[in-house]
Regions:
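The feature captures the catalytic groove of carbohydrate-active enzymes
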Residues: 37-69, 176-199, 206, 232-354, ...
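Beta-rich accessory regions
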Residues: 346-347, 352-367, 374, 479-487, ...
């Protein structure tokens, strides 16, 4: 009988060899792909740097532009921008150019200031160039400070915002009263840091999500707390039995939106000194700065001198905006105290993190219960319940863009968000805020809508665009979780219209005409709104957190761009680069779409989906 050969060792060796060969092929294939991705990263980075360099040269030649407020000018701004800003490129050349322009504009507003009050040197960020009568002594103004924090936080060098925060939170601006001059149109004295509404504590929180620094935070927390205490003491409704009791109030002027329609409706429904305003004549007294002189000359102003200041009514409003800012600040205080190693205990034995969380919840509940109108499906404005003159607790039944502010701060209860979602239909409606050239500040179907007057009762205001676009992005990304193509396209259309309004020689001004506008009006190179942050966080979905991780979830419609690159982004002391290409290999059939993320030049994550969330853990 022939003995059968034992083939097992041979087969085992064959299988082992095959496995090794297969593994080598897979590794080789993976290495080749990684090499392709790395080569494309190098190419896009170089292209973006070259484009930025050339465009800064172009921007520096523009005539009739304000001179820089600080040390960065045409002699040195190129090197500063190349070494500091997140690089960005896409297949849309308009948005590319505006992105780079906005950083060039921002560099002109980074100002050094020697404060004679405390003999310290600060970096501040200006809105207008020079020192306006309504500004702090440094020239900085609190009204756009929240937006400035959200944009400037993306610079690699963190010293600018740390110093800016220091100036407003514990420098002279935190306690020096706003100077009273011809532009001081209220009878309430307050520090420079509170002359206009703001959400600076939230802005500092947003900054620390990009550039964490627990030691600096520990030093700053008591001053952030004091900052909020000033808002609590001066700007809350004191009449305990009013509907708006305990809510935050402000003149619309010092909320940055003078001559608002909600104020118009409240004034018309007032008596006493404000019987001056009627449905037929209010435009003669409250429609732009050329009309307040008429009010100043009125019998009512003479009989009630404290009801007006230079013809502007001392009429306080409980607006969705200022209450949302308070919520954002309180929630930020809670988060920052929780992040701090020694969070502190208040006088009642409660942790400060819990204390501020409960206060934020109370503001949230009041906004939902008082300002939300179920019939209008919108957040409306009330007149303050403790107004000395004029209507109290009067609801102005008009939709204004400030009604979207709660979404900016993710203030809507997550489990109940669908009950508030109908408000966003007005963003896409020509009866609401949608117009040919851009977003309006009031609903167009209201009979008092007016986009021509210098008044925020219709005219476009980029400050509000920044609020609403982030609010809408938060609604799609954080509440709905998934979004339809038309929803993404609406956000993109608004961003593109805003970019296009900058013109061939980009410029950002104070206002635009939503129906026919081709360019911005007002002072050129004006820093009161965001754009880099709109691209980085809202559209491309780079989301920073206090933990050592980040996520990317673009809301970019897949059919709009062929590619984008976002890189040179400094985050938690790491360098981040992101590329999405619709087709990585044109020689292969079908789309080879891929989203790639590098950390410190190492490819760490990829996704074949543009719009699914990609999470990256930075922990070793």
């Amino acid at each position: 009988m022939n003995k059968l050969f034992n083939l097992s060792p041979i087969l085992s060796a064959y299988r082992l060899s095959f496995t090794v060969i297969l593994a080598c092929l897979i590794i080789s294939c993976s290495t080749q792909k990684s090499l392709v991705y790395d080569q494309e990263l190098k190419r896009m980075k170089t292209t973006s740097e070259n484009r930025l360099s050339a465009q800064v040269d172009e921007f520096n030649t523009y005539p009739n532009r304000p001179e820089s407020d600080g040390p960065f000018n045409k002699t040195n701004n190129k090197s500063f921008l190349l070494s500091n800003i997140p690089l960005f490129s896409s297949s849309d050349m308009t948005i590319n150019k505006v992105y780079n322009y906005r950083w060039w504009m921002i560099s002109k507003h980074l100002k050094t200031y020697h404060d004679p009050q405390d003999n310290k040197d600060y970096w501040v960020v200006t809105e207008f160039f020079g020192v306006k009568p309504w500004a702090s002594l440094s020239g900085a103004i609190t009204c756009p400070a929240g937006h400035q924090f959200y944009d400037v936080r993306w610079l690699r060098d963190e010293k600018f915002l740390k110093s800016y925060a220091d100036y407003f939170m514990r420098g002279s601006a935190s306690h020096l009263d706003q100077r009273e001059n011809g532009n001081f149109l209220t009878y309430m004295s307050r520090p420079e840091s509170h002359h206009f509404s703001s959400w600076m504590v939230d802005g500092i929180d947003a900054f620390l999500k990009i550039h964490p620094d627990k030691k600096w935070l520990h030093e700053m927390l008591p001053y952030l707390e004091k900052h909020q205490q000033v808002w609590d003491s001066l700007f809350t409704v004191r009449t305990s039995d009013s509907k708006t009791a305990g809510m935050y109030k402000i003149l619309d002027l010092y909320d940055g939106m003078e001559f608002s329609l909600s104020a118009v409706l409240g004034l018309i429904n007032s008596d006493g000194p404000y019987s001056l305003y009627t449905k037929d004549n209010w435009r003669n007294y409250y429609l732009g700065w050329e009309t307040t002189g008429n009010a100043e000359k009125s019998i009512q102003a003479k009989n009630y001198p404290k009801a007006f200041r230079k013809g502007y009514p001392d009429f306080y409003l409980v607006r969705p905006s200022v209450n949302s800012y308070a919520y954002g600040n309180l929630r930020a205080l809670s988060d920052l105290y929780r992040l701090n190693d020694s969070s502190g205990i208040n006088k009642n034995g409660q942790s400060k993190a819990d204390y501020y969380a409960s206060r934020a919840t109370k503001v949230q509940q009041q906004v939902m219960n008082v300002l939300w109108n179920k019939d209008d499906q919108f957040f409306n404005t009330y007149s303050a319940g403790d107004n000395i003159f004029g209507a109290r607790d009067f609801e102005a039944r008009v939709r204004e863009s400030v009604g979207y502010t709660p979404w900016y701060f993710n203030m809507i209860p997550v489990n109940d968000y669908k009950n508030y979602s109908k408000a966003w239909e007005m963003l896409a409606s020509r009866k609401g805020f949608f117009n040919t050239s851009g977003m309006t500040t009031a609903e167009q179907q209201h009979p008092y809508y007016n986009e021509q007057a210098y008044a925020w009762n219709g005219r476009g205001w980029p400050f509000e665009n920044s609020i609403v676009y982030k609010g809408y992005a938060n609604y799609l990304r954080n509440y709905k979780k998934s979004s339809t193509l038309p929803e993404k396209e609406l956000l993109y259309e608004y961003v593109y219209k805003l970019a296009k309004m900058h013109g061939d020689k980009p410029n950002i001004g104070e206002w635009y005409i939503p129906s026919t506008g081709k360019e911005f009006g007002g002072e050129a190179d004006y820093f009161h709104s965001t754009f880099p942050d709109i691209i980085i966080e809202d559209l491309l979905g780079f989301k920073g957190v206090h933990e050592n991780s980040f996520s990317v979830k673009p809301l970019l419609p897949k059919n709009k761009w062929d590619y984008f690159y976002l890189g040179n982004l400094r985050y938690h002391n790491h360098d981040i680069d992101i590329i999405w290409k619709k087709d990585w290999d044109a020689n292969k059939p079908g789309e080879q779409g891929k989203l790639c993320v590098w950390v410190d030049n190492k490819l760490v994550a990829t996704s074949s989906s543009l719009n699914e969330q990609l999470n990256v853990d930075l922990n070793p």
